[in-house]
């Protein structure tokens, strides 16, 4: 059974694009069914609500499901999907109906079968097929549902296999022609599903065609569990599906690039059934049948498709339109792809004949790393993860994980560590090699990895039967396999035996098991040389020759080995061991070795091994001399403490001999200021006038910089350094230019300003530098600039464009005000909008409609150049504005139809669903040191260990997590330079006292009263000194609470004596003066750098002070012992939310904090009219101690909460609307 269906389907797929049906849920919604409809007669007295259990309708409303199936077949569908998306026992448990899973699956398949047969009977030349649907369930096997325990799972691989097996049997029994595993958001779930399906096929003695369809969740191009499209494909390729595709989450416009990628890499047929666009404000889908068909037609004509249908929001009308659009279009031809081993973690790793040597990291192995073994034994898993992370950062493309140690529960340790690895993208991006001598440990590991990994290892030592059984399971789990050269006789130690065993194993795997040859990796045994035993002298050479033999005789098989074994005789002399590894790998790779288990951080380069030592090592490795071991031992001691030196680059200053124009270009590209004045003067002497130096070689050099930046070959910090060189050259030339009364031409004059009330300008400064690098003249008015000054200077300086920047949410209203004033005053200039709090939606809806001239949202520095060029070009401007208007019109239209992703609830309902904390059995901790604590001019050396460097790199548009970014393939070198410069500047600042950091905190008696928090003047708690006003989440939370910060303080009526903390810190005292001084010197790089490091110091101060409060001042976590990485990940008790941020988004509450602490008088920090903090590098907020306190986002609130908040604050409604605008619907 199934073979005929597959042949029939494949025949049709070669001739035309087949149609899958459309959305089932969408059609069910159109019936507007009520609770009683879902219950039917059978479930009238069921003990929980059943509305929404669409799959149950196959039992209670079968006629509706049949109508929907029939409508899709009438529209042209070839394949019906059964109504079983949520019919597994796991998903049905939500309705306590897990016992009905098999019945529902059977009934659903039977219904679809009946309808399909009816339509096939009408036209036997066009058979209709039933795809038994296996959905993703509501659990994830590779993601923890508990943010506090990334190693926890609420479902197991085995549990999923059991659930999917039950569903599969019923779907087959009901008459399914094929199995569709769809809407895969966690690949490990899908692997469990595929495992179940294959097991059931074997059990029933059948093999139906299998379709696989995954879900790319957003613009990141990844599944919910983090895999890229190709990594996802590699992980499930072993299923050998008839088709591989994508569905749901995205509309055709967004999904196109991923379907195109899949069409390039998939050896099987490609399917797609996208949504009808993205959901609007009402959760509905707006893409019409005609619009969707237009997209699909283009896909088909581009050769992406073999099967196509629709998902959420699609109807029979959509399918009919799509059927018409693809009719007669030639289906995608199956590509002829080269044979490769396709592995994956979160990202793909394809290994083929052209691939360079693959490094397998060896340090996550308890048998080979004393440090790793100690950490696992002590259950120091966070530090053990660091070992894995270091391996990847040092170049390991696969990590080998082994837990075989007598005192460990190897299976439990393997599962725990792999689950934790899955939560670390820097580690889980690479494939895993599950390494154990115990088969049960290997299986346990395979059940934890969502990518395609490698089993290390199986062999013939226990006979052919067990070898085959294990190989079949490896195949079913979807892994590649290492096969040891070991049979019933023993390990292969000669060239001949290595080939003999590998040949036998290869033919068993390929010919009898059906194992893909490209997924077979032989380990022909690397043994130690230079042992003093003559029989061992040929071990290395035999391995090298066996590599060549195996590659020649066994097509597509790969070769690996534990490289460190070869140097075992030289334990204790790491330098010589590294030299042996380098030489051995050099010859192995030449003969065809594909990968090796190595310490990725200690690989030496063959050519860097000193010649004398290299020759001695080669004598041993290649067994060229009978006295090779003795000679190597003699010279080994001389190298015991050495490390490979690197010769000085003698050509470092070779560029100084180049022509001056090339020297200037080199200096600009490399950011070298050392010779710039000297070279600029030389260029001036050669020019007829000084302006020619700017317009000639200097601008030529900056054009090269601009090109490299645009191509991604230079990064923002380098561009800023280039600008520094340019400014110094121009500053030198200015007196000569002025003396000649000459004027320079520019691409345009742009005024930039951070709006009134806002003090943040790092982003604006970077935009200014990038624009200057592209020959725009910049007038920077700085921060907190009132509207009147902006417009006055714009008129006086006759600027071409005005650019506004802001970070805090009140700045959005100020930008609207500036736009209105520009309209009122008759300006015609383009207006640019940028900054962290701005968005295209806000620009289109709130700003652009108040000003008739172009208003352009600029989301990053690199885009600014193109925008300004287009706006000031007579040729480009009309088309640019037309596209901009259309884009904004679409944005406004989408916004007008937008509703919250979750249904809003009343304030009364939200309060009724507050966080249910057990105050009766909880005693709030009393402070160890109550009162106010001031930290004036704290040593920067104290704060530097608390710095989180990741946001620092983001400031410079270098995306990646510290410290991994320092080794990033593309930006690593620049990140290292930037990191070095930042620390050098911090050293200077610390040494010379150029920046000061001050802060303060205090703890106050407090109690919650409804949504607000009363703060008392003393411990008698009789007098309310302050009230902290809070907002509550106001959308439906079926599985959680509607949080408000007051939930974390003991209610007044509880009688519990609780406390709240307040703090304010700054790392920026002196930062503005320093930045201005650097700017005056033409050094934009250090001007931006000082702002960036001041910001980091402020955040570090906040982290440091919170730790001090937890451990000493409040003292509720006196035993806490966390690393800086733990602090960054917030692995501590308590929270420190800041006014103006998601949990307490209303900025004016800072004024209360300032009063409580007397901040301005004590440490000099102040608030602007928009409640931005000055200095800008500052942090303030509240301290909560409750162990269940957590961060959350208030998000959108409703009118009833707006009125309540205004009333409690004593505000007019208009005032409340102004400060809460970001949390209100437009």
UniProtKB/Swiss-Prot annotation:
InterPro entries: Cbl-bd_cap, Cobalamin-bd, Cobalamin-bd_sf, Dihydropteroate_synth-like_sf, HCY_dom, HCY_dom_sf, Met_Synthase/Corrinoid, Met_synthase_B12-bd
Molecular function, one GO term: cobalamin binding
Positions contributing to methylcob(III)alamin binding: 695, 757-761, 805, 809, 861
Keyword Transferase: yes
UniProt keyword terms in alphabetical order: Amino-acid biosynthesis, Cobalamin, Cobalt, Metal-binding, Methionine biosynthesis, Methyltransferase, Repeat, S-adenosyl-L-methionine, Transferase, Zinc
Annotated B12-binding domain residues: 747-882
EC number: 2.1.1.13
SUPFAM superfamilies given in the database record: Cobalamin (vitamin B12)-binding domain (SSF52242), Dihydropteroate synthetase-like (SSF51717), Homocysteine S-methyltransferase (SSF82282), Methionine synthase activation domain-like (SSF56507), Methionine synthase domain (SSF47644)
Pathway noted in the entry: Amino-acid biosynthesis; L-methionine biosynthesis via de novo pathway; L-methionine from L-homocysteine (MetH route): step 1/1
GO biological process terms held by the UniProt record: homocysteine metabolic process; methionine biosynthetic process; methylation; tetrahydrofolate metabolic process
The keyword Amino-acid biosynthesis is assigned to this record: yes
Catalytic activity: (6S)-5-methyl-5,6,7,8-tetrahydrofolate + L-homocysteine = (6S)-5,6,7,8-tetrahydrofolate + L-methionine
CDD domains: methionine_synthase_B12_BD, MeTr
Cofactor(s) needed by this chain: methylcob(III)alamin; Zn(2+)
Top-level EC class as recorded in UniProt: transferase
Location of the AdoMet activation domain: 898-1226
Family, similarity comment: Belongs to the vitamin-B12 dependent methionine synthase family.
Job description of the protein: Catalyzes the transfer of a methyl group from methyl-cobalamin to homocysteine, yielding enzyme-bound cob(I)alamin and methionine. Subsequently, remethylates the cofactor using methyltetrahydrofolate.
Other information: L-homocysteine is bound via the zinc atom.
Protein's name according to its UniProt entry: Methionine synthase
Source lineage: Bacteria, Pseudomonadati, Pseudomonadota, Gammaproteobacteria, Vibrionales
């Amino acid at each position: 059974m199934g073979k005929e269906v597959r042949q029939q389907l494949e025949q049709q797929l070669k001739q035309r694009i087949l149609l899958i049906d459309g959305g089932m849920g969408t059609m069910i919604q159109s019936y507007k069914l009520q609770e009683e409809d879902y219950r039917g007669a059978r479930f009238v007295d069921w003990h929980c609500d059943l509305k929404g259990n669409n799959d149950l309708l196959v039992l209670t409303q079968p006629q509706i499901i049949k109508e929907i199936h029939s409508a899709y077949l009438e529209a042209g569908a070839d394949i019906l999907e059964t109504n079983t998306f949520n019919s597994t026992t796991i998903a049905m448990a939500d309705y306590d109906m897990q016992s009905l899973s098999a019945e529902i699956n059977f009934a659903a398949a039977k219904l679809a079968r009946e309808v399909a047969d009816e339509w096939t009977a009408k036209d036997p030349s066009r058979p209709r097929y039933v795809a038994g649907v296996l959905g993703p369930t509501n659990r994830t096997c590779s993601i923890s549902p508990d943010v506090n325990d990334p190693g926890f799972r609420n479902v197991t691989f085995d549990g999923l296999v059991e659930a999917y097996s039950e569903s599969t049997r019923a779907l087959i029994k009901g008459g399914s022609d094929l199995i569709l595993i769809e809407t895969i958001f966690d690949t490990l779930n899908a692997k469990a599903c595929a495992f179940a399906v294959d097991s059931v096929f074997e059990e029933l003695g059948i093999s139906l065609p299998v379709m696989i369809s995954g879900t790319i969740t957003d613009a990141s191009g990844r599944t919910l569990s983090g895999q890229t499209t190709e990594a996802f494909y590699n992980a499930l390729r072993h299923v050998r599906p008839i088709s591989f595709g994508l569905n749901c989450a995205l509309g055709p416009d967004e999904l196109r690039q991923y379907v195109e990628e899949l069409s390039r890499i998939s050896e099987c047929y490609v399917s797609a059934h996208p949504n009808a666009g993205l959901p609007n404000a009402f959760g509905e889908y707006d893409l019409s049948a005609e619009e969707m068909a237009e997209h699909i037609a283009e896909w088909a004509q581009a050769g992406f498709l073999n099967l196509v249908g629709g998902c959420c929001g699609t109807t029979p009308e959509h399918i009919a339109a799509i059927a018409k659009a693809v009719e007669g279009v030639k289906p995608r031809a199956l590509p002829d792809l080269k044979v490769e081993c396709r592995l994956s973690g979160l990202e793909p790793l394809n290994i083929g004949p052209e691939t360079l040597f693959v490094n397998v990291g060896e340090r996550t192995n308890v048998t080979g790393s004393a440090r790793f073994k100690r950490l696992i034994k002590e259950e120091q898993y966070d530090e053990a993860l660091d070992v894995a992370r270091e391996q990847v950062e040092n170049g390991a493309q696969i990590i080998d994980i082994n837990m075989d140690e007598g005192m460990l529960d190897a299976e439990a340790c393997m599962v725990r560590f792999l689950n934790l690895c899955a939560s670390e993208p820097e580690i889980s991006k690479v494939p895993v090699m599950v390494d154990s001598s115990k088969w049960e440990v290997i299986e346990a590991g395979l059940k934890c990895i969502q990518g395609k990994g490698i089993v290390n290892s199986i062999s013939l030592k226990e006979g052919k039967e067990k070898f085959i059984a294990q190989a079949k399971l490896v195949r079913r789990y979807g892994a590649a396999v290492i096969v040891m050269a070991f049979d019933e006789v023993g390990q292969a130690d000669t060239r001949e035996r290595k080939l003999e065993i590998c040949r036998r194993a290869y033919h068993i795997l390929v010919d009898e098991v059906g194992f893909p040859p490209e997924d077979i990796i032989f380990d022909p045994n690397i043994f130690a040389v230079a042992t003093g035993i003559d029989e061992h002298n040929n071990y290395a050479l035999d391995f090298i020759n066996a590599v060549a033999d195996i590659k020649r005789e066994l097509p597509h098989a790969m070769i690996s080995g534990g490289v460190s074994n070869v140097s075992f005789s030289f334990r204790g002399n790491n330098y010589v061991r590294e030299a042996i590894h380098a030489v051995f790998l050099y010859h192995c790779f030449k003969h065809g070795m594909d990968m090796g288990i190595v310490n990725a951080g200690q690989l030496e380069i063959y050519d860097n091994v000193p010649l004398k030592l290299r020759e001695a090592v080669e004598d041993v490795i290649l067994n060229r001399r009978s006295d090779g071991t003795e000679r190597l031992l003699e010279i080994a001691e001389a190298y015991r403490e050495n490390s490979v030196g690197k010769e000085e680059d003698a050509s470092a200053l070779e560029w100084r001999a180049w022509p001056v124009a090339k020297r200037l270009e080199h200096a600009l590209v490399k950011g070298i200021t050392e010779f710039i004045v000297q070279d600029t003067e030389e260029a001036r002497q050669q020019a007829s006038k000084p302006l020619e130096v700017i317009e000639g070689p200097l601008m030529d050099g900056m054009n090269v910089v601009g090109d490299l930046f645009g191509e991604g070959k230079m990064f923002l910090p380098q561009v800023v350094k280039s600008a520094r060189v340019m400014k110094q050259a121009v500053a030198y030339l200015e007196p000569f230019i002025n003396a000649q009364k000459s004027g320079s031409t520019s691409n345009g004059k742009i005024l930039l300003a951070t709006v009134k009330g806002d003090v943040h300008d790092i982003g604006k400064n970077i935009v200014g530098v990038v624009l200057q690098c592209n020959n725009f003249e910049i007038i920077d008015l700085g921060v907190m600039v009132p509207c009147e000054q902006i417009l006055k200077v714009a008129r006086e300086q006759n600027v071409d464009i005005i650019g506004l920047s802001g970070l805090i949410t009140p700045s959005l209203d100020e930008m609207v005000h500036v736009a209105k004033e520009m309209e009122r005053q008759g300006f015609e200039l383009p207006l640019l909008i940028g900054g962290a709090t701005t968005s295209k939606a806000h620009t289109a809806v709130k700003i652009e409609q108040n000003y008739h001239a172009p208003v352009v949202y600029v989301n990053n520095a690199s885009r600014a150049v193109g925008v300004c060029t287009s706006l000031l070009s007579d040729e480009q401007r009309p088309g640019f504005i037309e596209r901009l208007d259309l884009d904004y019109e679409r944005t406004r239209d989408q916004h007008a139809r937008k509703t919250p992703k979750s249904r809003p609830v009343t304030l009364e309902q939200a309060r009724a669903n507050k966080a249910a904390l057990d105050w009766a059995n909880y005693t709030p901790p009393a402070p160890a040191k109550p009162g106010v604590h001031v930290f004036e001019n704290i040593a920067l050396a104290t704060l530097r260990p608390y710095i989180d460097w990741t946001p620092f790199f983001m400031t410079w548009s270098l995306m990646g997590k510290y410290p991994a970014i320092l080794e990033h393939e593309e930006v690593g070198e620049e990140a290292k330079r930037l990191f070095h410069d930042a620390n050098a500047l911090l050293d200077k600042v610390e040494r010379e006292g150029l920046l000061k950091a001050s802060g303060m905190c205090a703890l106050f008696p407090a109690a919650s009263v409804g949504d607000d928090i009363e703060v008392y003047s003393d411990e008698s708690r009789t007098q309310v000194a302050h009230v902290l006003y809070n907002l509550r989440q106001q959308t439906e939370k079926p599985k959680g609470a509607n949080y408000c910060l007051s939930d974390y303080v003991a209610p007044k009526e509880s009688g519990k004596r609780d406390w709240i903390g307040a703090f304010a810190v700054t790392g920026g005292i002196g930062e503005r003066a320093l930045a201005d001084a650097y700017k005056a010197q033409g050094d934009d790089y250090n001007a931006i750098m000082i702002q960036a490091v001041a910001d980091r110091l402020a955040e570090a101060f906040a982290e440091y002070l919170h730790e001090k409060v937890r451990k000493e001042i409040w003292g509720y976590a006196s035993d806490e012992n966390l690393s800086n990485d733990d602090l960054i990940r917030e692995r501590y008790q308590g929270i420190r939310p800041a006014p103006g941020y998601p949990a307490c988004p209303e900025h004016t509450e800072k004024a209360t904090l300032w009063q409580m602490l007397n901040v301005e008088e004590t440490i000099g920090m102040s608030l602007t009219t928009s409640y931005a903090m000055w200095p800008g590098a500052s942090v303030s907020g509240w301290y909560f101690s409750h162990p269940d306190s957590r961060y959350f986002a208030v998000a959108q609130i409703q009118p009833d909460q707006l009125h309540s908040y205004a009333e409690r604050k004593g505000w007019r409604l208009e005032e409340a609307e102004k400060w809460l605008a970001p949390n209100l619907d437009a």
